């Protein structure tokens, strides 16, 4: 059951040209990728609306439960997430010529703390630069990165002008990275 992993939230990060003459302001790099071969490792079955516009849910029915909740092959999702988030992080650093000395904060997608810890370990990311918030909010899917940045901004750690490297992973499989100045 994956439901214990999920939280509810929304967020956005608006990235644009910087206010200064420094060409390093704003968004420096983005990359997104997809591989549909992982679709059946993390998915939500959808009912056929053409047969019935209303879903009648029976909480005692295993068949109904499979149609209402996300399904996941955890080991495969974990391995793909770690591998692709590491690849996306490497690519971001290589394409920009930046190193961990240049990056103020690493903000991975908050799907699972073990995934984040593995990405940090394999990428040799300085642990004090890695920010997590899953312990407070759960996996809020697309909102995890903005919520994490906002959480640590309110705590006083993340500040305007900080350089952030973010890497993400999602169903299907999809993954990507971005480097931007806050």
Describe the predicted segments one by one.
Residues 82, 86-87, 93, 104-182:
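Claisen-condensing/thiolase-fold acyl-transfer catalytic domains that form or cleave C-C bonds
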Residues 1-79, 83, 87, 182:
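Condensing-enzyme catalytic core mediating Claisen C-C bond formation in acyl metabolism
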Residues 97-102:
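Short, surface-exposed connector motifs at secondary-structure boundaries
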């Amino acid at each position: 059951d994956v439901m214990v992993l999920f939280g509810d939230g929304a967020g956005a990060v608006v990235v644009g040209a910087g206010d200064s003459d420094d060409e390093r302001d704003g968004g420096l790099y983005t990359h997104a990728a997809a591989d549909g071969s992982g679709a059946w490792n993390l998915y939500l079955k959808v009912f056929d609306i053409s047969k019935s516009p209303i879903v009648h849910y029976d909480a005692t029915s295993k068949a109904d439960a499979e149609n209402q909740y996300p399904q996941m092959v955890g080991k495969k999702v974990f391995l793909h997430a770690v591998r692709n988030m590491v690849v996306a992080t490497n690519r971001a650093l290589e394409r920009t010529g930046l190193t961990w000395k240049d990056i103020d904060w690493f903000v991975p997608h908050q799907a699972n703390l073990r995934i984040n810890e593995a990405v940090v370990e394999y990428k040799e990311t300085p642990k004090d630069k890695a920010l997590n918030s899953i312990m407070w909010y759960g996996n809020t899917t697309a909102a995890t990165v903005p919520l994490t940045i906002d959480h640590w901004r309110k705590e006083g750690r993340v500040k305007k002008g900080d350089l952030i490297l973010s890497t993400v992973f999602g169903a299907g499989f999809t993954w990507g990275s971005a480097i931007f100045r806050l």
